[in-house]
């Protein structure tokens, strides 16, 4: 048995405006070069756009988008006998949520358009409607795991 202690993991504090940990997680991943105020502005503008376009609570739209993009399984590369296998592994909920947020932001950054806030708001709305590049990425990951199910015993 290992003598090493397990990592407790940090508690993320809730966002001051929305009082939500998920929003704070989004802000921290949007963050570039330590400019947190810029990240907050981007997210708050995106939330306003979502509110105006959908006439729904923007927090509910964000939650739904992240829930729909969160993957259940992923593939990990494992070397065995000189060849590399893509082995499907289950993902913990927190890890899946972090992946979902990263995929949504990557898809938003790739979008053509004006500001990052505008692109992020549209990507979140698309993800909530189960369209968009982030959803495509999740489906692609699930397809990859399904295709490599035969290698599941290599964990």
From Swiss-Prot:
GO molecular function: rRNA binding; structural constituent of ribosome
SUPFAM superfamilies cross-referenced by the UniProt entry: Ribosomal protein S7
GO biological process, one term: translation
InterPro entries, per the entry: Ribosomal_uS7, Ribosomal_uS7_bac/org-type, Ribosomal_uS7_CS, Ribosomal_uS7_dom, Ribosomal_uS7_dom_sf
Pfam families with a match to the protein in the record: Ribosomal_S7
TM region positions: none
Keyword flag rRNA-binding: yes
PROSITE patterns: RIBOSOMAL_S7 (PS00052)
Protein purpose: One of the primary rRNA binding proteins, it binds directly to 16S rRNA where it nucleates assembly of the head domain of the 30S subunit.
Descriptive protein name: Small ribosomal subunit protein uS7c
Gene assigned in the entry: rps7
């Amino acid at each position: 048995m290992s003598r090493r202690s397990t990592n407790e993991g940090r508690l993320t504090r809730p966002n001051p405006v929305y009082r939500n940990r998920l929003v704070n997680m989004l802000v921290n991943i949007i963050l570039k070069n330590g400019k947190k105020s810029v990240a907050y502005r981007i997210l708050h503008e995106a939330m306003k756009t979502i509110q105006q376009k959908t006439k729904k609570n923007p927090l509910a739209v964000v939650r739904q988008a992240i829930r729909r993009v969160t993957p259940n399984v992923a593939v990990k590369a494992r070397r065995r006998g000189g060849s590399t296998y893509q082995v499907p592994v289950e993902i913990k909920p927190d890890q899946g949520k972090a992946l979902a947020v990263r995929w949504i932001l990557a898809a938003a950054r790739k979008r053509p358009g004006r500001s990052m806030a505008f692109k992020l708001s549209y990507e979140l709305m698309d993800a909530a409607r189960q369209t968009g590049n982030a959803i495509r990425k999740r489906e692609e990951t699930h397809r990859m795991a399904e295709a490599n199910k035969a290698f599941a015993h290599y964990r």
